[in-house]
């Protein structure tokens, strides 16, 4: 079974208009941080004021951290959590 991070649609795959706060954590800590927000995943994101907070796993199943960053930043840019267009 291939392991990958879903690429966001082009219209959400761009720089965030505010401040981006990026936390790269060991996989276990990233999962715990996301679980505290009700997200059961390796990575997550949320908006806080004019900031986009990204929780990115280090040592996770996908080694390309930029793939996680693109995916999670897209959620701050309006991509729905169910990944619909």
Language-model regions: role of each:
Residues 1-22:
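N-terminal low-complexity, Pro/Thr/Ser-rich intrinsically disordered segments
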Residues 50-70, 80-84:
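Short pre-active-site segment immediately N-terminal to the catalytic Zn-binding motif
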Residues 74, 78:
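Short active-site segment of divalent metal-dependent hydrolases/proteases
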Residues 11-15, 24-51, 63:
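Catalytic zinc-binding patch centered on the HExxH motif and its immediate surroundings
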């Amino acid at each position: 079974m291939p392991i990958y991070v879903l690429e966001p649609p082009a219209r959400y795959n761009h720089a965030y208009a505010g401040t981006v706060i990026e936390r790269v954590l060991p996989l276990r800590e990233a999962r715990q941080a996301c679980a505290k927000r009700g997200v059961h995943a390796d990575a997550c994101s949320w908006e806080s004021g004019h900031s986009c907070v990204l929780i990115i796993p280090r040592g996770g199943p996908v080694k390309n951290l930029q793939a996680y960053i693109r995916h999670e930043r897209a959620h701050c840019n309006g991509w729905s959590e169910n990944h619909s267009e």
